[in-house]
């Protein structure tokens, strides 16, 4: 509004000021000009008084309202609000008035309000400068001042000091762990995280201690703006210094915790890399020791009394300064000395407790302490073991033997590293466990590679050549598996059994129903469950076909007539030279044996109608003919008995039999056979 706009009264102020310049002082006139009608001597004081009155009555209220508006607009912006309130209070408190501060505040605000109008800005600045030359005391708005002070007091003094510390410390060089880990520091990843320079030992000594006290004094100097005293009583000082250290060491610990949490050992791509990494960690310039040295140097601090004494000395230095600031500093120095053992130390104590376990890993000469030495010895053994496994033309076989031994309980350097690491504090414990775990994973991977080669060369190749896509594994195949091939593959000490015993058995366990991979440290061979399932099928097939003779397939079974259509007079089942003839009447089971010795296993079922007409089915493809004939029949478990019901349908004529095997699982239940499919890779 015009009542608030200083620009609106600028012409009037200019006119009033120029009027004071019309008459020169009498001392500046020639002698003849002083005589006669010259009225300057009595007029100049009147004009000046009028101009000063306009400055006080027109310009000053507008400036005050201008400042009040800025205060209201920035109640949520503490830094701006503090400057606005300070300038506003200077209008009403001559004892705290600083002309340069007021001039700067108004010049900045007018530049914002009247951007581009340099002439008007210059004119207003000149008028305000003349206003400052005369005494005045503007009646401030106590309600607004109280509101502003309440807003300012929402942020504690310690937070203000800490905020200023952080802002002023931005010029400090940033800290990165990777710049201090030596030539082999690349074994660590994530060590490039930036830590602000304030949160280092150098930042603590050269900035926090050196600048903390002076910032307290600078802020205390503004306490009059808050309506508070510029000195601190013992309780206030204790609280302030305690809160400042709490804020600082809380963030200090957070920065170092976060930086260390990002550090990890580089992932391994081979056992050679694992050997190199273990070797680097125990080398003369071990990056692990270098990292621990950096942690200790930057997270080990003086005791509470020593720390406070340093702050006291800093305050005492400033106390030697002359003037009000020196007096305030002297008060702080005196009170700090008296309270040296009373400042709360919770945040610092927490930081020291957090990192003390890492400090203990080093001796006073920055070497490995007795807590760390066993781990370094275990790492040396691991380096040698991994190097041995990764060398030579038979490295895969050596790795396979190593994995087999460890899976079966033999201790190794990997176990020693795990045991030693478990006694160390994190994150060192995590790093070394990761090294051991990654190395073990690589060992298992190389063992799998070796095992997969053996599998493809010794088992899968035989399977594809002799069994794959042949009957009885494929029900509709026209090609039968040679009985000799079947025998050599599935018999005890046959192809499948030898492969399992030689290569797989050390790595698996059997719970009575299925095979499971054994694991150590939560890891097992990276092979698929499919192969284990197929090894289970091998066992099922062996128990069904080789129960009578471990070296030859042999099935003894009995066939018992169950029912015959009334239109049939008899049914004749034949396997080689073995026969069961059934007519209506007493049921007499017959014993059979497969494979049949005669007629190459020719199998048939012939039924005869009452009229004498005969019809039937016959299979003569070799020893698997019996199974092919049974495949033409409907099979189902017979309720209440461990037998299969065979239901033959020959042109609508039905004959049913009960098939009883002396072994379990029933070899004529071909579920395991039909599900037997070896994958191309483990």
Residue map of PLM features:
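C-terminal domain/tail detector
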Residues: 2-682
